[in-house]
């Protein structure tokens, strides 16, 4: 017949039977996989009438000589794999062994397709139509369109499944049932009779082979990790190595067919430091289920308690953390670093259902893990000097809670003296080289040092020193800045408690998490920080008032001494500097005052030690540091040194 649009001679497949099925399969493959072949209908049938390449003809003839009964199925799968020109040359002119190996691989793929399609047909809806086509070979024929997806119903809650492997199997000439819905339970493995019924003659199915779907000769093409629920088609992936026949996507998309989560496990959650919680893009469910499965294997009791852990797992966790703390000689371990140390020691993640472990001073909530650890009997949760929560053995908790008030670990009064009165804040250059021991030795001159902490950073510029007695802190703050430790200039400032910031930041973050997180994420005691914050605020207020009182008293003493020592002739300042030369008399008076007040004239031995460690260019320079806080600096005596000649009379004042 002649096409009216393209004015070319075309051959309709219904009117002419000259085209065999292998050529039609090859054309269908090209039509599906190659966009450039998607012409109009009249152009499509005109392309069908074209001659198939000679290589395909020769390869088809060789396969037909070996497998005359199933040449259409075998050669169709070969063409669906989209062989390039070299592979076609191997099929057409290669050795006989290569051809036989290709045919055997194709038979194995066909066996898998038959087995999978039989399992899918067993779960098809009643009256579901087949998708088989065109005829011959005694197989059922139905005039349905190839590669057509099942219609989507009006309800949006039912997902439909389409398997290109099943459509390709239907194109090979047999009837399969197309599943119209996702079943609630995975299908049962096909029986040997069903496999033999769908398998072509000459293909032997080994029923004694292991696995849910045995294959020919015990060769396992299916992998239990690659499919689930009876709806993953590895044969389709094998037939389409470029991803064209395995459901149009990766194995992860194919695994989505059975309803399981395709998200990968969260690496940070397995280590206990995932900050995204339920909003994480990765899966937390699989990691937690693995932990529960391991607990069941070890004989743990499976009675769930609030917090997502079991009593048996709590005992195991307590024993492991106790062993970890004993290996560190009882030193406190911060909750932020506990999961990392736990993973390094035991090779598994320290995890409870949905907790966070970031430090509260960074504005992250870590209540769930803190509450979990507080349930352990042999471990106490304490609050360290600068706002971090740490875990310590119960027998060692008293050493760290005597001035902190318990910190939530039990024991002690929450209204005791805050840490701000026991420690100081240090600032120093980034190029300093001294260690924590050097800082402890230097400040040990003022009083017993409890702890020195310098954060491990690439450019360290601050640190904290805590003392046994608050009087030591007051003594150091009354000294003049700077201090010199190993030649480095160190400034000392009072440590300010950040309990108020902790309360506000944590509560604000918890409130912001309300629309996104379940209620168990913000189960915490708001009274944990209230009493401590009130006590620290009162102590800071008292300390500031005491400091202001001392400064005011010192100013008054200095003013009285200056007025009493001033000669009568200089009581009035209406004379000029040239007429009255008070400098000589002022020097004599200052010498007399130095003899009367040896505490003002003689230098402090601690100050001598500090200046002796300073560099040569700085040891002799006594100056005020504008960077330091002006509150804790005592005023200098106006008679400590004589003023140079030529100064104004304001020097005396």
UniProtKB/Swiss-Prot annotation:
Molecular function (Gene Ontology), one example: RNA binding
Region (Disordered): 242-261, 598-623
Compositionally biased tracts (Polar residues): 609-620
HTH OST-type domain segment(s): 313-396
InterPro entries: AtC3H46-like_PABC-like, AtC3H46-like_RRM, Nucleotide-bd_a/b_plait_sf, OST-HTH/LOTUS_dom, RBD_domain_sf, RRM_dom, Znf_CCCH, Znf_CCCH_sf
Chain ranges passing through the membrane: none
RRM domain location: 422-497
Name of the protein in its database record: Zinc finger CCCH domain-containing protein 54
């Amino acid at each position: 017949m002649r096409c009216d649009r393209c004015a070319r001679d075309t051959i309709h497949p219904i009117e002419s039977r000259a085209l065999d099925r292998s050529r039609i399969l090859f054309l269908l493959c090209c039509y599906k996989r190659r966009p450039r072949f998607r012409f109009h209908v009249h152009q499509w049938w005109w392309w069908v009438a074209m001659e198939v390449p000679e290589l395909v003809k020769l390869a088809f003839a060789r396969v037909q000589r070996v497998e005359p009964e199933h040449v259409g199925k075998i050669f169709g799968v070969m063409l669906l794999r989209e062989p390039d020109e070299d592979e076609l040359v191997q099929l057409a002119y290669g050795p006989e062994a290569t051809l036989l190996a290709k045919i055997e691989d194709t038979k194995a793929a066909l066996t898998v397709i038959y087995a999978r399609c039989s399992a899918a047909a067993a779960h098809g809806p009643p009256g579901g139509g087949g998708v088989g086509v065109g005829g011959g070979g005694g197989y059922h024929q139905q005039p349905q369109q190839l590669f057509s997806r099942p219609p989507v119903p009006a309800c949006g809650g039912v997902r439909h499944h389409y398997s290109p492997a099943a459509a390709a199997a239907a194109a090979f000439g047999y009837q399969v049932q197309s599943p119209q819905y996702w079943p609630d339970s995975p299908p049962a493995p096909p029986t040997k009779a069903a496999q033999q019924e769908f398998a072509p003659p000459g293909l032997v199915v080994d029923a004694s082979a292991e696995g849910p779907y045995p294959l020919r000769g015990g060769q396992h093409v299916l992998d239990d990790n690659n499919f689930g629920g009876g709806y993953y088609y590895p044969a389709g992936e094998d037939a389409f190595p470029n991803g064209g026949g395995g459901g149009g996507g990766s194995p992860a998309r194919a695994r989505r067919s059975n309803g399981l989560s395709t998200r990968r496990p969260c690496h940070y959650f397995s280590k206990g430091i995932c900050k995204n919680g339920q909003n994480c893009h990765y899966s937390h469910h699989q990691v937690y289920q693995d932990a529960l499965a391991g607990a069941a294997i070890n004989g743990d009791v499976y009675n769930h308690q609030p917090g997502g852990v079991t009593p048996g797992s709590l005992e195991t966790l307590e024993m492991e953390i106790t062993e970890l703390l004993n290996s560190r000689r009882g030193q406190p371990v911060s909750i932020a670093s506990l999961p990392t140390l736990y993973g390094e020691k035991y090779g598994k993640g320290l995890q409870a259902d949905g907790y966070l472990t970031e430090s509260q001073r960074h504005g992250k909530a870590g209540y769930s893990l803190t509450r979990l650890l507080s349930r352990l009997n042999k471990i106490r949760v304490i609050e360290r000097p600068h706002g971090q929560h740490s875990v310590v053995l119960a027998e060692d908790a008293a050493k760290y809670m005597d001035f902190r008030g318990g910190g939530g670990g039990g024991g002690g009064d929450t209204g005791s003296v805050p840490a701000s009165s026991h420690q100081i804040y240090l600032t120093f250059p980034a190029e300093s080289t001294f260690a924590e021991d050097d800082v402890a030795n230097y400040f040990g001159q003022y009083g017993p040092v409890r702890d020195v902490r310098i954060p491990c950073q690439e450019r360290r510029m601050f640190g904290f020193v805590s003392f046994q007695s608050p009087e030591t802190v007051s003594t150091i703050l009354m000294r003049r800045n700077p201090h010199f430790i190993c030649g480095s200039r160190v400034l000392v400032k009072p440590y300010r408690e950040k309990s108020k910031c902790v309360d506000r930041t944590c509560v604000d973050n918890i409130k912001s998490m309300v629309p996104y997180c379940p209620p168990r994420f913000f189960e915490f005691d708001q009274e944990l920080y209230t009493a401590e914050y009130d006590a620290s605020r009162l102590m800071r207020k008292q300390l500031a008032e005491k400091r202001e009182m001392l400064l005011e008293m010192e100013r008054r003493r200095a003013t009285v001494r200056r007025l009493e020592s001033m000669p009568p002739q200089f009581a009035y300042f209406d004379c000029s500097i040239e007429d009255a030369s008070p400098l000589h008399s002022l020097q004599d008076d200052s010498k007399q005052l130095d003899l009367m007040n040896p505490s003002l004239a003689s230098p402090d031995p601690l100050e001598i030690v500090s200046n002796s460690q300073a560099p040569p260019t700085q040891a002799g320079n006594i100056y005020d540091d504008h960077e330091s806080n002006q509150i804790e600096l005592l005023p200098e005596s106006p008679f400590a040194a004589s003023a140079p000649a030529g100064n104004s009379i304001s020097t005396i004042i």
